């Protein structure tokens, strides 16, 4: 078994070397130095039923530790257990995001600045034309440019994000644009970590302190692989109080729950959200993934291949 793992590892390394050259070996060494695992003595007692991440004890433990312990905070993105939930965009998918970014033309200095952020020690890979960057940052940047192409300037908009991770999408949006409000909607532990992360990169969001209270309306709602990963009860609350009160929307829908939890599937979602349409997710990160949008200007300028 051990020999087989070594053989598989060597085959993978050879494939990477043929595709990306010597830099791929250096990347793996450096990422191998960064990666770490949670001590078995650290266990959270907190559980949030109704979502994949909220019910994962190891993930919630890392979130809580990163928010309260600055040493953990400085490296939480490279934690093995955390990467099972977030920060798991691989090298090849990162290249696809970069290809899509390049199709949008010359990237602004602030977008490039964001892509190169190394805060909290994510895995990074070498890409031609941009250097060693986190593939997750490339994804957030590509989604930002999608949103800008679909909806125009985000300046002055009241934005709500459902499922905020550690604040990667909020980071680039508030770095490059100036929303009048950015509502973070997630479990309390995640919102606390997100606010700490955004503060660490010099961003002060105009938001409120309660992720359970909602404004009368929003100009844009965003959800990347999150709305589709929660139970119907929570979905109905968000649908009623956020989505149906938002003029525009960008929701990446996945099928990770399948039949594990009763939830609103994508066809029901578009039937209930006026003006919503399904377009192809680029790059496609899951065979049944869909991108749902509404309130958009046009999809003519959107990268679609």
Question: For each predicted feature, which ranges?
Answer:
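A short, conserved alpha-helix within the catalytic core of class I
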Residues: 230-242
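A short SAM/SAH-binding and catalytic strip from SAM-dependent methyltransferases
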Residues: 220-233
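Conserved alpha-helix/loop element of class I SAM-dependent methyltransferases that forms part
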Residues: 137-155
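S-adenosyl-L-methionine
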Residues: 196-215
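Conserved beta-strand signature within the Rossmann-like core of class I S-adenosyl-L-methionine
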Residues: 246-257
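Conserved class I S-adenosyl-L-methionine
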Residues: 155-165
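N-terminal accessory regions of S-adenosyl-L-methionine
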Residues: 2-133, 302-303
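Conserved SAM-binding loop of SAM-dependent methyltransferases across substrates and taxa
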Residues: 166-178
């Amino acid at each position: 078994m051990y020999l087989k793992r070594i053989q598989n590892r060597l085959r993978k390394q050879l494939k990477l070397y043929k595709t990306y050259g010597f830099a791929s070996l250096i990347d793996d060494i450096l990422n191998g130095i960064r990666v770490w695992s949670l001590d078995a003595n650290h266990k959270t007692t907190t559980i949030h039923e109704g979502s994949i991440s909220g019910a994962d004890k190891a993930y919630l433990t890392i979130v809580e530790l990163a928010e309260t312990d600055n040493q953990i905070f400085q490296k939480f993105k490279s934690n093995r257990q955390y990467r099972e939930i977030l920060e798991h965009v691989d090298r090849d998918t990162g290249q696809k995001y970069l290809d899509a970014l390049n199709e949008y033309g010359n990237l602004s200095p602030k977008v490039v600045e964001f892509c190169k952020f190394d805060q909290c020690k994510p895995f990074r890979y070498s890409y031609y034309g941009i250097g060693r960057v986190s593939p997750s940052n490339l994804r957030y940047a590509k989604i930002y440019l999608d949103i800008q192409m679909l909806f125009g300037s985000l300046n002055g908009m009241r934005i709500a994000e459902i499922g905020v991770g550690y604040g990667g999408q909020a980071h680039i949006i508030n770095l490059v644009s100036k929303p009048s409000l950015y509502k973070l909607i997630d479990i309390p532990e995640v919102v606390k970590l997100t606010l700490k992360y955004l503060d660490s990169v010099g961003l002060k969001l105009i938001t409120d302190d309660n992720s359970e209270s909602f404004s009368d309306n929003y100009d844009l709602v965003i959800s990347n692989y999150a709305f589709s990963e929660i139970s119907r009860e929570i979905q109905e609350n968000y649908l009623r109080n956020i989505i149906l009160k938002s003029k525009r929307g960008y929701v990446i829908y996945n099928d990770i729950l399948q039949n594990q939890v009763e939830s609103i599937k994508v066809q029901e979602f578009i039937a209930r959200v006026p003006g919503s349409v399904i377009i192809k997710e680029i790059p496609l990160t899951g065979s049944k993934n869909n991108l749902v949008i509404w309130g958009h200007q046009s999809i003519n300028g959107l990268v679609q291949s």
